[in-house]
Amino acid sequence: MFSLSFIVIAVIIVVALLILFSFVPIGLWISALAAGVHVGIGTLVGMRLRRVSPRKVIAPLIKAHKAGLALTTNQLESHYLAGGNVDRVVDANIAAQRADIDLPFERAAAIDLAGRDVLEAVQMSVNPKVIETPFIAGVAMNGIEVKAKARITVRANIARLVGGAGEETIIARVGEGIVSTIGSSKHHTEVLENPDNISKTVLSKGLDSGTAFEILSIDIADVDISKNIGADLQTEQALADKNIAQAKAEERRAMAVATEQEMKARVQEMHAKVVEAESEVPLAMAEALRSGNISVKDYYNLKNIEADTGMRNAINKRTDQSDDESPEH
């Protein structure tokens, strides 16, 4: 009986220990105690009940304590529950402390929740980043296209990381400044001879306003001559004028052809009327003879006149052809 009771008690103890170990990461608790971070077992159990991974909170807390940061479990757990990256925020705070940058935990957490890489921002504040633009084309006043590539050295502005514009805005603004500077040059050789004028002009415009960066310098890395845009435009305009002139000439030719066809149709119409009128002449002559308006003698005289006229016309026609065929002396 005694042995049975002992076995039951032992089983209960083992089950209790298993339940305890499933809720309380004893190894993590011991590590925290060894690091001088006092975390109660009840706190760890509460994290389990709130579906918070204790390791993702306690491990960064140990790291912060070793770095001398006064952070609490509640701060880290709140940031974890908000969907933030606790480990990265703590690393950013440690890096900021080492670089003597004022970065409270609340600001770092806000930057992280805003979707920014807060650790990279701190590192960029210490080691500025170089952004290289693609070739940006501008046209000088003499019509020559000039392409320039710039290297922009920027430093993260932690105070404007939340709500500030990103790298794309910096590149777009610098590109706009390069195009404006090239376009205001009277000759493309001015750009080639003094590329630093682009840097000075662009840098003086305060292009980092409203962005998450501070522009330290803008250096022109390369300048190339592309093509003569002015000449190309003039060529295209001349070609367009030529096409317009050809189209108008074709229109006039079509109108002339249409007019010619219309005149031919009218000639045929008039010829048909003449034939119709000639066909009525015999009827009119017969009616005149019948009514006595013309005598038979007059009729034959008219026929003789027509025959004489036809003969003269034939003779004249043959004479003209002979003159045309005779060789020149």
From Swiss-Prot:
Question: Where is the protein found, in the record's own terms?
Answer: Cell membrane; Membrane raft
Q: How does it sit in the membrane?
A: Multi-pass membrane protein
Instruction: Give me the segments passing through the membrane.
Output: 6-26, 27-47
Gene Ontology cellular-component terms for this entry are: membrane raft; plasma membrane
- Source organism superkingdom: Bacteria
HAMAP family on file? FloA (MF_01562)
Hey, which family's this protein in?
Belongs to the flotillin-like FloA family.
Q: What does this protein do?
A: Found in functional membrane microdomains (FMM) that may be equivalent to eukaryotic membrane rafts. FMMs are highly dynamic and increase in number as cells age. Flotillins are thought to be important factors in membrane fluidity.
Summary of subunit composition and partner proteins: Homooligomerizes.
Official protein name in the record: Flotillin-like protein FloA
According to its UniProt entry, this protein's organism is: Staphylococcus aureus (strain NCTC 8325 / PS 47)
Q: Which gene encodes it?
A: floA
